[in-house]
Amino acid sequence: MSKVCIIAWVHGRVQGVGFRYTTQHEAQRLGLTGYARNLDDGSVEVVACGESEQVDKLMKWLKDGGPRSARVDRVLSEPHRPGEELTGFRIRY
């Protein structure tokens, strides 16, 4: 299996609904490193690194709508090379 990193931007009703916390829980369950943080435009940025199959599972979870309290309208993503070593999956502010 190969290691990959992606950066994704999740748009919709994704702030103020526990989206970052449930994303963190799901990413940790999948053994991924990275972070989730709110952006000023109302979206959430997610960086996820790990085995490609596990990253794909997180992306599917995001595209399927994430937590029940959220409404995901669109998820954009691209390969990413973090400028720092990521340990654990964190919520950034």
Curated annotation (Swiss-Prot):
Keywords: Hydrolase. This is Acylphosphatase. Gene3D superfamilies: 3.30.70.100. Disulfide bonds: none annotated. InterPro entries: Acylphosphatase, Acylphosphatase-like_dom, Acylphosphatase-like_dom_sf, Acylphosphatase_bac, Acylphosphatase_CS. It comes from the Bacteria. Pfam families: Acylphosphatase. The active site is at residues 20, 38. It comes from Citrobacter koseri (strain ATCC BAA-895 / CDC 4225-83 / SGSC4696). One of its GO terms (molecular function) is acylphosphatase activity. It catalyses: an acyl phosphate + H2O = a carboxylate + phosphate + H(+). The keyword rRNA processing does not apply. HAMAP family: Acylphosphatase_entero. Belongs to the acylphosphatase family. Its EC number is 3.6.1.7. PANTHER family: ACYLPHOSPHATASE. Residues 5-93 form the Acylphosphatase-like domain.
